[in-house]
Amino acid sequence: MKKVGEEEIKQEENEKEKIVKKLNESDVKSIIEDVLKNKEKYGLEARWLLGMDDNKNDSIEVLLGRVNFIEVERGFIEIVPMTRMVVLLKRVNYYTSNYTSYNDELYVFFYSVGWVKFS
């Protein structure tokens, strides 16, 4: 199996005309906050825990809305037009799959930024 570097991954994703941004410690929270502050722009209508997949390194999917897809993986975040918004969180570097939910609000713990409230 060929091991693909971050630059090759980025190039491949750019060829698919996706918006790919390399994460740093401040990017994770600022991008999520931008999405949540601009709910009209991103079309967020609902948020709930969709499920946990034990076959994918404890990644979780959180359904937040209907417009964009945000994937946190391999040190990159992708914002891709779709019919819903899903956040995939993995236990790698800046993020973790620790989560909790209160009254239809989701809190996810990121190692670099602490608890982030999805509401």
Swiss-Prot record:
Keywords: Coiled coil. Residues 1-29 form a coiled coil. It comes from the Viruses. The keyword Coiled coil applies. This is Uncharacterized protein ORF119. It comes from Acidianus filamentous virus 2 (isolate Italy/Pozzuoli).
